[in-house]
Amino acid sequence: MSGPYEKKMAVLTDLSTSSHPVTKDSPTLPESSATDMGYYNGHLSTGQHDFFQTQAYSPTISSYGYPHPPHPQYNFNGLVGNESFLPKDDYQYGYRPFVHYREPPVQETVSVKEEPETEVRMVNGKPKKIRKPRTIYSSYQLAALQRRFQKAQYLALPERAELAAQLGLTQTQVKIWFQNRRSKFKKLYKNGEGPDMEHSPNNSDSMACNSPSSPPIWDNSGSRTPLQQQQQQQSLPQCSSPSYLENYHSWYTQQNQSGQHLQPSEVMHQPPPDTVY
């Protein structure tokens, strides 16, 4: 018991040297420690606990070998004076409001991640993407797109935006339509075929019939009678259509049967009757 007690006294002696230096003539350690303890006890406020709780005869041995109180309690009332020191517990911006504002974004991100993907479906145990529905164009939209495609097969961004706004379509739909039409025409020309009559402007656009019809290769109007010219005008339609070839073929057959044959080479070098030299 004497060993821990002497170590305790040595620690207290070291603390007292900061305010009162120890002289060489100090007889023993217990007298110095007793004086120091009286000094500290006298300067602290009366009626309060000591700055150090001295439990000298019931210590707990620490891992370092010297005794210390199990739960040291400090009293700062003597240092401050009669006023008591109270820490400020309430703050202007607490932690709970911050947590409250941070919780909704976290819940939102989790809910977005948990949404199932509607474009992927399991078919026979394998994921398969659902194909988007095909865009259905009206006859007016097809006619306007076809007219614009005949003018230019490639559209600039402002032109594409303007055309999409006029037809009530998106720019992506107009872009895809032009891409499909270009690839289709390239495939037809590669195979040696012309554009089919189904998608020609004569069938897809009713306003394209206002264009003048192409004249025949040779003109034999000078040798025909007025009755024959009237029959030709009646047989030729006002707009170019698939029936135009049939009417022209029937008219040409009637001309051959009447016995009036003209060589194309002679007619082509023949000047028209109204030419003035």
From Swiss-Prot:
MF-aspect GO terms: DNA-binding transcription factor activity, RNA polymerase II-specific; RNA polymerase II cis-regulatory region sequence-specific DNA binding
Keyword entries, A-Z: Developmental protein, DNA-binding, Homeobox, Nucleus
Chain segments carrying region Disordered: 1-33, 191-277
UniProt gene name: dll2
Record field: compositional bias (Polar residues): 14-33, 200-212, 250-263
Compositional bias annotation for Low complexity: 226-243
Similarity remark: Belongs to the distal-less homeobox family.
Organism expressing this protein natively: Xenopus laevis (African clawed frog)
Stated role: May have a regulatory function in the initial formation of the epidermis.
Cellular localization per UniProt: Nucleus
GO BP annotations, alphabetical order: embryonic skeletal system development; epithelial cell differentiation; regulation of transcription by RNA polymerase II
Entries under Pfam families matching the protein: DLL_N (PF12413), Homeodomain (PF00046)
Example of a GO cellular component annotation carried by this entry: nucleus
Identification of the protein by name: Homeobox protein DLL-2
Tissue expression from the record: Expressed in the embryonic ectoderm and is specifically repressed in the CNS. High level of expression in adult skin.
